[in-house]
Amino acid sequence: MEPTFHAFMFPWFAFGHMIPFLHLANKLAEKGHQITFLLPKKAQKQLEHHNLFPDSIVFHPLTIPHVNGLPAGAETTSDISISMDNLLSEALDLTRDQVEAAVRALRPDLIFFDFAHWIPEIAKEHMIKSVSYMIVSATTIAYTFAPGGVLGVPPPGYPSSKVLYRENDAHALATLSIFYKRLYHQITTGFKSCDIIALRTCNEIEGKFCDYISSQYHKKVLLTGPMLPEQDTSKPLEEQLSHFLSRFPPRSVVFCALGSQIVLEKDQFQELCLGMELTGLPFLIAVKPPRGSSTVEEGLPEGFQERVKGRGVVWGGWVQQPLILDHPSIGCFVNHCGPGTIWECLMTDCQMVLLPFLGDQVLFTRLMTEEFKVSVEVSREKTGWFSKESLSDAIKSVMDKDSDLGKLVRSNHAKLKETLGSHGLLTGYVDKFVEELQEYLI
């Protein structure tokens, strides 16, 4: 029997980071390893149902120190606007004493981290291994966080002429520029000083970008595969949504979801709704209420609900995205191109229309659209604005089975799904990852 290890996990205080770390923790626990998961106190309740091995994965809550400017009680990115991320990062750095005390008391064999660049210092002092585990795409890491990199400029030797920023991406780079200096320092410092770099991806999608990162940091890069979550079949799809979707033929409904951090301005939210209406297809929109509105209904265009009654639903609350994507009536998924969302969608038969908002989403969109040609990107103006016509045109182009573009993306998506779904591929990544970790610990 292979020896087991005890790992600490300390992800950035965002559910988009904590949940993928917990998916990895589940895979490690399944193989008999012990995990101590460090997280903000308030986040524990929301993560408990993702813990499939509560006897092996122990949550270790941290008290988040107060930082001037951070709202009282704010502990995760869900509690703040994107512009306050730097303040939450300060709070994360101030938990160092708590983390070090836990390391001293519990003596793990290794510690996984992402933004806490000081973890390798603690690890070396206590003779344990540190793993910089990145859940963002390897494409983004290669382009944005190469040593000596400059925001928005491809670094020397970058391995793609297609996966690039363009003039119309200034809106996404503007958001990234707010915290780029901090992020660049955190990630590059972590990469240079850690023992192991690990990425949530696979060679079939991002192999050349992983090789580039390895060459830039002179370290072997371990891959976990996409770490797809186990499907939660304990709760069926919300009855109201299930009833709505079941009224339509297979692969006829357009589903739109933009992730937990994207809040649209009211005029852009209305343009999104009008674009979905313009397709003439049945649709389900699941997004947060627009700025200045407490509900999605408040922000809808005048007369919209009456015009789309029976064929369109705008949902302002949380939805069971994996169950919706698995529903036979869903034919197209309009999304923000978060890597986790794309991995989910690639394993379905839904066609993809991509509407990226943040820098990492833009690059992953180009990978899917320009290199793999499995999706279509919604065109934008230089300001970042997208029109109802550009959204409608993108959706109709992938939903038209007879168009050249529709045939191309369907064919390429089917091939990629077959590759990723081939027997043993994804479990093989996890097995190899664990084996390589154990070799480092010998």
UniProtKB/Swiss-Prot annotation:
Q: Which SUPFAM superfamilies match?
A: UDP-Glycosyltransferase/glycogen phosphorylase
**Single Gene Ontology MF annotation:** UDP-glucosyltransferase activity
Q: Where does UDP-alpha-D-glucose bind?
A: 260, 319-321, 336-344, 358-361
InterPro entries in the record, alphabetically? UDP-glycosyltransf_plant, UDP_glucos_trans
| Pfam families the record matches | UDPGT
Q: Which CDD domains match?
A: GT1_Gtf-like
Q: What class of enzyme is it?
A: transferase
- Write the record's keywords in alphabetical order, separated by commas: Glycosyltransferase, Transferase
Per the UniProt entry, the Enzyme Commission number(s) are 2.4.1.-
What does the sequence similarity comment in the record state about its family?
Belongs to the UDP-glycosyltransferase family.
PANTHER family given in the database record: GLYCOSYLTRANSFERASE (PTHR48049), UDP-GLYCOSYLTRANSFERASE 79B7-RELATED (PTHR48049:SF91)
Q: What is this protein called?
A: UDP-glycosyltransferase 79B8
